[in-house]
Amino acid sequence: MRPLLAAALMLIVAGCASTGPETASYAPQSGAESDAQTRARIHTELAAGYLELGNYGVALQEAAEALKSEPNYAPALSVLGLVYMELRDDKTAEANFQRALRISPLDSDANHNYGTFLCQRKREQESIKYFLAALRNPLYATPDKSWVNAGICARQTGDLTAADEYFQKALKLRPTQPQALFEMADMAYKRKNYSEAKAYIERMQPDVTQTAGMLWLALRVERGLGNRNAEASLGFQLRRSFPDSREARALMAGQYE
């Protein structure tokens, strides 16, 4: 799953929790959740789960059920936007994101997810505006993810200064933010600053799930440093764990760049 979408899904599920700031506008003043809101929240969580599994038909059904219970439930509209984004129905996706923001313009999830859509559709400058809007909420539970996505989108435009700034802000909030560390390591590698790249890689928590991309970057960093034993060890891990990956194929072909 693409990093931007994965982050968006994590935010949606977290945002549907009754204590999350993203759903505050839907809760009664007493803080209690009505039966309709409870049903909408549960169906939205199910929709997000099915979306993550790639079961788009059921995700659409669950989101529709959520909106039957609570027609103006912004988290459900955000999930609908993400589903239609995956289905490449961009017009419907954008309509759902925009409707969510009309209902709840300060909703951090809605801003973040619309930013995700815009960035994936190569509308990076627009997307960054929405990631920054998500960060205006002082109660936002996962601001590091919006800083990371803003950095990824800035990097896609070639604005490495802004990307560096956004990744550093993510790391200030969460020093072990794995995607920010990976991006900073990759940027350092591209500058041929292998020592700096390795320092970022070593900051990743040991329990972070390794990906083919992480192993491939670490391998090339060790190669740049001339550490042949470490390079060979990482190559073995890459071939064993991800034998069919693009990175493993590049390794076998000796294509390091």
Task: Give the predicted meaning of each segment.
Residues 39, 73, 107, 141-143, ...:
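Residue-level recognition of tetratricopeptide repeat
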Residues 35, 69, 103-104, 137-139, ...:
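Structural marker of alpha-solenoid helical repeat scaffolds
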Residues 14-35:
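Bacterial Sec signal peptide processing site at the extreme N-terminus
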Residues 52, 86-87, 120-121, 156-157, ...:
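Register position in tetratricopeptide repeats
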Residues 76, 110, 144-146, 180, ...:
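TPR alpha-solenoid repeat register
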Residues 45, 79, 113, 147-149, ...:
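Canonical tetratricopeptide repeat
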